[in-house]
C-alpha cells in the first residue's frame, strides 16, 4: 500500500463504511481499530458488521490495495475520528475515546493537516481537542485545520446515504470549515452546509433528540390507547389523514447508539433547559419496562388458564428492523428481563440477523412459531412478516408488524 492520504480511527458501523467509500475513489486509506479481530477481518477483505453493499466495497478496496487496517495510526494528511462516545455514571457523556484517539495522533500531525471528528460529541468537544493538540504541540497552533462533521445515516442504507445525504460541517475557524468542505466534496453528492464546530455538534444532538421526542409522543399514545381500549395503530393512521399531522409509529422503546443516546448529551450539559427532551427519554425508557410487564402478565394468565407454564417466543433483538446492531436495543433489554424473571420456562429467542450471541441461545423463526404458546413481536424484521400464526397462539405485537 502506498503512503495513505487518510487515517480513519475507528472501524465500526460508521468508520468502516466511510473508509470503504473513500477507498473506492482510489484514495489510500489506513484504518485503525483497537480490536485485532476487526483488523484481521478487514485485511482479509471481509466485514464484521451487517450492512448492505459494505462487504463488496471492503473486499474490492482491500483487493485493489486502497484500504488497509491496523492497530496503530500512521502519518497522513487527513485524520478522521469515528470512535464511540459512551456514558459515564448518571448518563454523563464520556469523550475519553475521542481524547485517546487524538493523543495517538499528536506526534503525527504536521502543519496543513486536516483533523475531523465525526463521533457524536457534547458541545465543545472539538474545541477541547483543539486545546489538547495545541497544548502538546504548540508549534502547530493555527497551522492545523480542525473541524466537526457528524454523520447522519440510517443503518441498513449507510452506503447510499453517506454519499447522498446533506452534511453539516463546522470548523474551529473559517479556514478549517472550508478545508473540511473541500475534503468531503470529493466523496459526497449531498449539499455541504458550513457552520462552526459548536453548532455542528449541537445539530447532531438536536436531530436525534427531535426524533426521540416525536417517538415518545407515539409511545405515550400507545400507553393511553391500551388503557382506553383503542387500537393505537388505527388511531395514528386516522390522525395522520390530517394534512398537518404526522405522528410516528410506537414501538417497544428506542434504541441504537444515536436516538437513544444523544439526548443525554444535551440533558447532561443543560439540565434546567431540556425538560421536554429529558421527559421524552423517560417515556421511551419506560415503554420497554411496560412491555416486560405486559409479557409477564400474559404468561401468568396463560399459566392460570392452562395449569402449565407457557412456551414464549421473543421475536427480534436488534434496535431496528433488518440489521444486526443490538446497541442500546430495547428489544434486547426486554428479552434479558424476561429470561431473568423466568423459572423453569421455555423461551425461544429469535434474531435472524445474527448467527450467535454470548447471552442468548438463538432459535430459528420457524421453530419458534411452531412451538410457542405466546409470540412477542419486538422488531419488525422482514422475515417476521406474513408469518402464518395458529388461531390459539397468543400474540403480543409491540412493533405493529401485524397491522
Model-predicted segments: where are they?
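Structural/interface elements that position substrates and couple domains in central-metabolism enzymes
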Residues: 1-403
